[in-house]
Amino acid sequence: MQLTVKALQGRECNLQVPEDEQVSTLKQLVSEKLNVPVRQQRLLFKGKALADGKRLSDYSIGPNSKLNLVVKPLEKVLLAEGTARRLADSPPPPVWHLISKVLARHFSAADASRVLEQLQRDYERSLSRLTLDDIERLASRFLHPEGTEAMEKGLSK
């Protein structure tokens, strides 16, 4: 099938690909035609970003479809890759190590491990549920503790 890939800067190319082609393969073809490195590409179809591991058919992309190409700045790509690498290489936070020591004093090794895993899951779930308002409130309390103390005293009267 014939596809048109249009970059936001105005350049575009036409590509002939099978309907079940991998998005990652399409990105490689775009790289060859438009000289945009694969890692800087973000392909969009009807406003939705295409994932590398999926096929064009997963997004119902048919013949003569038009895809948009967003070119990510190299600095952002390198920063994101560096951050991901640091996170993967970093040891668990010291707090989890301390908690595991405390649990080891009160539970068997197997039970302590299960309790720690459940605690970490609960913690991650709680963090993922925080709204921007919640985060803003927490930040305000840390940045202006005297203001929140006054508000809490006023509310408790």
Curated annotation (Swiss-Prot):
This protein's record includes keyword Cytoplasm: yes
Gene3D superfamilies found in the cross-reference section: Phosphatidylinositol 3-kinase Catalytic Subunit, Chain A, domain 1 (3.10.20.90)
Entry's Gene Ontology cellular component terms: BAT3 complex; cytosol; nucleus
Function summary: As part of a cytosolic protein quality control complex, the BAG6/BAT3 complex, maintains misfolded and hydrophobic patches-containing proteins in a soluble state and participates in their proper delivery to the endoplasmic reticulum or alternatively can promote their sorting to the proteasome where they undergo degradation. The BAG6/BAT3 complex is involved in the post-translational delivery of tail-anchored/type II transmembrane proteins to the endoplasmic reticulum membrane.
Organism: Oryctolagus cuniculus (Rabbit)
Superkingdom of source: Eukaryota
PTM entry text: Polyubiquitinated. Ubiquitination by AMFR and deubiquitination by USP13 may regulate the interaction between the BAG6/BAT3 complex and SGTA and therefore may regulate client proteins fate.
Main subcellular location of this protein, as a coarse class: cytoplasm
Phosphoserine: residues bearing it: S90
Domain (Ubiquitin-like) ranges: 1-76
UniProt keyword annotation of Cytoplasm present: yes
Official protein name in the record: Ubiquitin-like protein 4A
Required and sufficient for interaction with BAG6: region residues: 96-138
Alphabetical keyword list: Cytoplasm, Isopeptide bond, Nucleus, Phosphoprotein, Transport, Ubl conjugation
Record location of the Glycyl lysine isopeptide (Lys-Gly) (interchain with G-Cter in ubiquitin) cross-link: K48
Transmembrane portions of the chain: none
A biological-process GO annotation: tail-anchored membrane protein insertion into ER membrane
Gene name as annotated: UBL4A
